[in-house]
């Protein structure tokens, strides 16, 4: 059975760029009848927090992703240590003693000579006495993985045949001098131990994959299938980061965007499919073929998100908006009629709040065209108001004044709402009610 994973670090809020791999993995699991694992890569003890870990779960739930399995990298240190010991015993993990300053000076010398800035494996030439002397100075080793000087290739789910020339890479540091692990080794160990069959992640990990394939092989573990998708950028083509709060999933949720709109744009942009609002995950899973994702960066444009969200709102039945309308203070006995009256003018549910204030007042009316207003007052029908009240009333005003089109409707809109634009007044008038409408037509704030 297919088992995919999404492995964020709980060091900040997820942004829309994180949503893309999370969704692509979840959709691939649905498409293949597989399972989805949420693994928190929380080995960075200084920056990882439980608050961010909880926020990740909330954000995924908002997107509609319910993990089948859960794991924490920090709970698997013993397995990481055992793997490191095996690599040491096999001669594939070796100690290095250079300081960051020494490595930087060496890198600059290489660049000055026109050489690639690759680690020269000087630590492998140290004798036992030299290592002991360095440790006597107080130096503690960091540990590098000894890469085999060969090309690693794989059949990528997105890119097709892919390869990395490991001979052109520095041996990667797997363990810091303080004994903590960098991303590379724990990720491989956990993928192997937890039975991950497919690793779907951003194309910025392609070089990592070449390295990690060698680590899988050195540990005698099965190598998963890899897929590297294009990355989301801002509308200006800049990379996304956790610092872009307005594009964090938390920020988008609090701003009133629909998860279906966010899902659709995050996944369909940069794919072979046209970008449109897809309401459910199963339909979206059927549309997303990893092999048809573009190689070019995919731009996430908030203006496009607004358009998708508006289309969802315009078709949203009251039952889906009811709880949020209640949160806005709109009473249940009037909320459905209100929602049906205003939704066509909204791009997000919270935008309904100002229109409720227009309904309930007070509104400062703007009175123009005295003849139209006078006829409106004289012909204002008795309650109850219904769906046909507006048409019957405006027909009578037209008969009395000869006003039509904008000359008829704009004075009434300004008097009843104080605004030049807004929802269809046929829906708003019954909500405003006769008494309040009469007061506004007389020029009173109501």
Swiss-Prot record:
One of its GO terms (molecular function) is glutamate-tRNA ligase activity. PROSITE patterns: AA_TRNA_LIGASE_I. GO terms for biological process: glutamyl-tRNA aminoacylation. The keyword Protein biosynthesis applies. It is an enzyme of class 6 (ligase). Its main location: cytoplasm. Its EC number is 6.1.1.17. A motif ('HIGH' region) lies at residues 8-18. It catalyses: tRNA(Glu) + L-glutamate + ATP = L-glutamyl-tRNA(Glu) + AMP + diphosphate. GO terms for cellular component: cytoplasm. Monomer. Catalyzes the attachment of glutamate to tRNA(Glu) in a two-step reaction: glutamate is first activated by ATP to form Glu-AMP and then transferred to the acceptor end of tRNA(Glu). Belongs to the class-I aminoacyl-tRNA synthetase family. Glutamate--tRNA ligase type 1 subfamily. This is Glutamate--tRNA ligase 2. It comes from Methylobacterium radiotolerans (strain ATCC 27329 / DSM 1819 / JCM 2831 / NBRC 15690 / NCIMB 10815 / 0-1). The lineage of its organism: Bacteria, Pseudomonadati, Pseudomonadota, Alphaproteobacteria, Hyphomicrobiales. The gene is gltX2.
